[in-house]
C-alpha cells in the first residue's frame, strides 16, 4: 500500500515506522539516482532544471547585496574618500542593544548601528564605474529580474514539452563549443566592453551612463586603429603615475595596455591592463569554442583525440581508449572533474586577489584582504574534497572494467598500491622532519640557547623570486640581473611596471621569505599530502581492497559488514572523505595562520616579529594566536563593551559549535540508542506526558549519519571561531 508520507521518492523509506524515515529521507533527497522509478533521461532533466534554480538564488543574493548597500550603506560618501571612510554593509536592528552597543556600532558616518563591509564589494563597484546609489539600485532591480527569469526557466524545463532529450545532454562537443565560446568567450568580451566603455572613462572623470554611452568615444580615434591594423595606438598615452583615480588629473587615453605593476594611488592593477587581459581571454576562448566537430563535419572529435592518445612505446597500455564514453556517461566523473577545476581556481583566486589586487583601494583595506583570502581558501578546500568524493562514487556506481580494459584509468587502479604507499611515505617524511625541526627549535628557545636553532634559508624559492625580478637576495639572475635580455625587454616591452612592483615593500607581491617561511611551507605541504593521501586512497580503494574485495557492493557509505568480518569498519569511501575533511581544515588553518600573521607584521611595519617567532611552535601559539586574541577576549568585560563585542561573542559561540561536534564524533550509536530507549520508557511511564505519542518510533542516527552531524558541527564551529578571530584581530588593530 502506497503511503503519502515523506519521502515521496522512496516508498520503502516512506513506510519505515521509525525516525529513520526522516533522516534517511533527508540524506537521500539529492541522490536522484536512487529514487523510485528514476530513468537516466529524467535524472539529467532534473539536474538540468535545478541548475536554473541555483543561478536564480545566486542572482537574488547579488541583487540583495546591491539593494542593501544602496538603501542602508554609505557608498556615495565612501566614493569621496575611500581611504578613510569605512564602507557600510547594512544597518543592524537589534532589540537587545543597550545605549553602549548603539554607540559602539554607529560608525562610518551612519545615524544608527551598522555592519562594516569586509567583502570588497565597495571597491569592486567603484572600480567598474559605479558612483551613485542610483547605479546600485538599477543593478539590483536588473539582477532581481534576471533571477525571476532563471526561476521561470527552471520551471519551464521541467514541463514535458520543454525537457531536453538524453541525446542532447550527451552531446559533449556542442556543449563544449557553446560553453567555451558563449560562456567564457563572449562573456569575457562583454566584460572587456564594459571596462573600456564605462569603467576606464569613469576612472578618468568622464561619466558614462545609459544617457550617453552611445555618444562617448572610449578612445579619441574610435575604431579606426582597429580596422587599419594600427592596434598599438590603443596602448599609447596610458595613465601616468600621478593619475588621481576617478578624475582627469594625470590621466591618459590608452584603453588596452601592458604596463604591469600597480596604480600608485589605488595600489590596484591598471584598469587598462585588465581590459587587455579580458580581451585576450575572449579571443582565445571564442577560437577554442570552434574546435569541436558538430553540424558541419569540420573540427575535432573528442573521442578521436582521446583514442589517438596512445604512446607508441606502449608504456600507457591502451592509452585513453574508452575514456570518452566513460566520462560522457558518468555524471559523477563529470562533476568530479568540474569540482577539481573549480576548487583549484578558487584557491588561485585567493592567492591572486591579495598579491595582485584588481580593485581600487582594496590593498589598503586590510580586514577585507584577510577576509577574502581566508574565505576563498576554505571554499577551495571543501570543493576539492567534493571532487574526490564524486570520483569515488564514480568508481562504485559508474566504472565499467570491461569498457576501460588496459587504459590509463584501469592502470591507475592496477598500480594503486604504489601511488598510496608513495603518498604515505611523503606524508611521513614531511611530518617527522617538519615537526622535528619545530620541536628542536622550541627546546633551544626553552633552554636559553636560541642561537642553536636549526634555521634553513629557502634558497630555491628565493632563487625563483629572483628570477622574477626580486633584487633583495642578490642572485643576479634573469629579471633581477641588469645585464640579462629578460631585464632589457621587461623594461621596454613586457610589463615595464613589474620590477617596481616586485621590489616595493608596500605590497604583497613576492614577499621576502626566510627560515620561518621554509618551516611553515613544509607544514602546509604535510597537510596537503596527507589530505591527498586520504582522498586518493578513498577513491582508489572504493571498489575493493585486499581486506574487502567486494566493497563496491556495499555502496559509497557503510559503517561495517557486521561482526562477522572484523576490521571492515571505517573503510567505506565516505569514511575517507570524512577523515580527509578534518585534514583539509587542519591544512587551511595552517595556510591562513601563515598568511594572516605574515601580513599583520607586514602591515604594522614589524616583519621581524614573524621572522623571529615563526621558527618554533611556542612563537606561533604565543605571538600569533594569544597576542592577537587579546582584542577578542576584551570585546566585552565587566567595564563595558566595544564594537568588537559581536566578534568576541561569535568566537565563544564558534567554540561551542565546534565542541558539540565531538559529542557525535566520539560516542557511537549504541550509546544514543540506549539513552533514547530509556527516555522512551520514562515518557511512557509519565502521566499526562504519555497522552502525547509519536508516529515514528524514535531510534538513534546511524553511525554514518552521526559522523556527518559531528563533521558539520566541527567544520562550522572551526570556521566561525577563526572568522571571528581574523576579523576582530585585524579590524581591532587597523580600524
UniProtKB/Swiss-Prot annotation:
Any one of the GO CC terms: photosystem I
Topology with respect to the bilayer: Multi-pass membrane protein
Q: How changing residue 655 to C/G/N/S affects the protein?
A: Contains somewhat decreased amounts of PSI, depending on the strain; significantly changes the spin density of the P700+ cation radical
Keyword flag Iron-sulfur: yes
Q: Which residues bind [4Fe-4S] cluster?
A: 560, 569
Q: Which reactions is this enzyme annotated as catalysing?
A: reduced [plastocyanin] + hnu + oxidized [2Fe-2S]-[ferredoxin] = oxidized [plastocyanin] + reduced [2Fe-2S]-[ferredoxin]
The primary site where this protein sits is plastid
The listed outcome for residue 560 to H is: Loss of PSI assembly and function
Catalytic activity, EC: 1.97.1.12
For this protein, what does the record note about how its cofactor is bound? P700 is a chlorophyll a/chlorophyll a' dimer, A0 is one or more chlorophyll a, A1 is one or both phylloquinones and FX is a shared 4Fe-4S iron-sulfur center.
**Record note on what altering residue 565 to E does:** Loss of PSI assembly and function
For this entry, the protein name equals Photosystem I P700 chlorophyll a apoprotein A2
What residues does chlorophyll a B1 bind to? Answer: 655
The cross-references to InterPro entries, in alphabetical order and at most eight, read: PSI_PsaA/B, PSI_PsaA/B_CS, PSI_PsaA/B_sf, PSI_PsaB
**Under which main EC class is this enzyme filed?**
oxidoreductase
What keywords are assigned to this protein? 4Fe-4S, Chlorophyll, Chloroplast, Chromophore, Electron transport, Iron, Iron-sulfur, Magnesium, Membrane, Metal-binding, Oxidoreductase, Photosynthesis, Photosystem I, Plastid, Thylakoid, Transmembrane, Transmembrane helix, Transport
In the record, the note on similarity to other proteins reads: Belongs to the PsaA/PsaB family.
Record-listed chlorophyll a B3 binding positions? 663, 671
- Binding-site positions, phylloquinone: 672
The protein's role, per its UniProt record: PsaA and PsaB bind P700, the primary electron donor of photosystem I (PSI), as well as the electron acceptors A0, A1 and FX. PSI is a plastocyanin/cytochrome c6-ferredoxin oxidoreductase, converting photonic excitation into a charge separation, which transfers an electron from the donor P700 chlorophyll pair to the spectroscopically characterized acceptors A0, A1, FX, FA and FB in turn. Oxidized P700 is reduced on the lumenal side of the thylakoid membrane by plastocyanin or cytochrome c6.
Q: Where found? A: Plastid, Chloroplast thylakoid membrane
Question: Which residue ranges does UniProt annotate as crossing the membrane?
Answer: 47-70, 136-159, 176-200, 274-292, 331-354, 370-396, 418-440, 518-536, 576-597, 644-666, 708-728
